[in-house]
Structures are given as C-alpha cells and as structure tokens.
Amino acid sequence: MNGPHILDHYRTQLADQISERGNELPDFNPLNISPWLAMSLMQKSIRRGREDLALRSAATLLKISPERLWRRLCITAYEDIGVADYEVVSLVTAALKGKRLRAEIGGEWAVASYLIGIMCEAIKCRAADDLAVVIDWHPDLENARLDFTFKPIPELLKLATGNGTLPERALAVWYAIGTDRCSSSVLRERRGDPQAVFDYLCEIGFPDTVVDIAREGFRKCNEVIAPFTVPLWREAQQFARHAEPDDIPEEEMIGEVPGWAYDMHVREGNQAMARFLETDCKTTRWVEANLPPNGRVKFMGGILFRVESGLVSNRLRWEVGDDLRRMAEYECPGLRHKKAAEIMNLLRRDLPMLNEARHNVAT
C-alpha cells in the first residue's frame, strides 16, 4: 500500500495548480442563508456546473460552518463525480488533510474556490449513489440482503470480488465495511472491518491509487459511496463512454437562491412539498389516488430528487451507470415501472406550482 505517497502526490499537484492560478481569487460573497440550505445549494450547483452559485454557497459555509464545507465537498466528489473524473476526486480528497495543509498552499478560500471550479467543470457520474439505492431497495437483492448479514468478513471479501452481479458484490463490500458505521434504513446492523476491505482490494490487484484515495475519502466522510468507487472504477474501464447533459427543468429564483435548492434535505423544502400536496393539480390527484396519507412528503421528495434535485449538467453515459440509474429510478420506489414514470412526468410538469409553494415558505 502506498497511501501516504499517493496522497502526498496529489497534495503537491493541488498546491502547484493553485499556485499557477495566481493571487486573483473569486470574490468572497456569502449568502444570508442557513448552513443546511447552503450545503444543498452548493452540492446541486456543482451538479449543474453553476460555479457562481457554488462559490457563494461555499463562502457561506466557510464563514459560518467550515467543517460542513469540507465534509460536503468530500461527499459531493464521490457522490456526483466519482469514476467520471477520478483525478478531481483525488484532488478534493487530498485537500481534506486539514487546515495546516490548506494554509500552506494558499488558504481556505483559495483551496475551496479552486476545488469548486474544477468540480463544476468535471463530468459527473452518480453511479455510486444509485448503487447504494439499488442495494437498499431493489427486490432482486432481497435474499442477498438477508443472507450476507451473517457471513464472516473473509467470506464477504470473496463475494465482493467474485462472480456475482455488481449490486451483489457492492452489498458484500457494504457489510464488510460495516453497517454500524455506514448505516442503512434497510440493511441489518453488523460490525465490519474497513481496513481489511481496503487492504484486500489492494492485495487482489485493484490499483493502489484508486483504493487508497477511496480509503482516505471513506476516512474523511464515513460514507459507503467512497469504497463503492473502487469496483465502479474497474467496471468503467470496460465500457465505451461519452457525456451528455440531463434535461434540466427551467430554473426559478427565490430571492438569491434557485428553487431547486429547496429539496427534501432542507426543512423549507419539506414544508414546501407539504404545501404543494395541499393544492389541486394532476400530481396531487395522482398522490391522492395512489399513496396512503402517511409518508407522502417523504415519497414525493424522492421523486423530486429524480426529476430536479439530482440532475447534472454533464452526465457520464456508460452501460453500467445507465443501468444503475434505471434500476434506482424505476425499479426501487415500490411502484411498477409504468407508475414510477407516470408520477415523475406529472411532477415535472407541475414544478411551477411547487415553486410557488417554495416562494410562500421562503418568504
């Protein structure tokens, strides 16, 4: 394992790139919003390549909650960029060493603003997050979710690199990492051994660079999407790839913040969804006909993520990533494929009414 040398290499590379940019930094112009809304806005702005908004939300976090800024950048790198640009993921991970490193290579704002720029520009791949959704909810994994719970870690490691499907192999990784550390609303809790997982991946031939960057990313953010990038990286080497933009709905500003920042991860976003569900439109009539009263806001928050919040400006298209996205969107919500597509289309058309509810909540 060459983890320290690999990380030192990327820290040197990051320092050189920041130095080449010179002393002219973007304006530090924070917004007057909560840290939760700032985190939502920053991550979704990076997804959409909106550097202007990403910088302002990053400045907000750096001013009022800097620890949230660095953790959110880490999560965004693995969740939204991943195997599409592992170089960018590596640079973000390298910057997480701590304040002393960042002070030595230009300071907090110099480093954060540089990372925001390259993350906005990077091609995006959300396969790691889609993979986590599939593992939790796909019906084809019901037996494996139970069976793998009780297997010893050496057996899980063999399953993680065996002949099973990618979701089955990643499920074995999750249990071996430990669901006590990376919790799931579905998987049973058990202890794991993260060090054994990363060591084993190195031993059987995964590139040290890929494994040790994921190891450090996991150490910093404690999210299972970091180790998922290792098997996904190998899969990505086997398929033709190209990038294209998602079909993103028209944006509506609510003060200085776009409506799409108000999603299920923000209190105001859930309040707006609850108000929207009290209106009369095709989406709410569908909800009345198909969903029990309890849990409607949460369910529709997940649908909203698929039609607005989770969209990206430049998505990596490749067979495995496309399959995982399809499985997560249409085969996991507990609805038949036809109905999942139906409610997504209805909500997309009724987004102007949701934005009106967002305006009412925000003001």
Give short role names for the model-derived ranges.
Residues 22-23, 53-56, 63-363:
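C-terminal alpha-helical interaction modules of replication/initiation AAA+ assemblies
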Residues 31, 38-60:
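Conserved helicase/translocase motor-coupling segment
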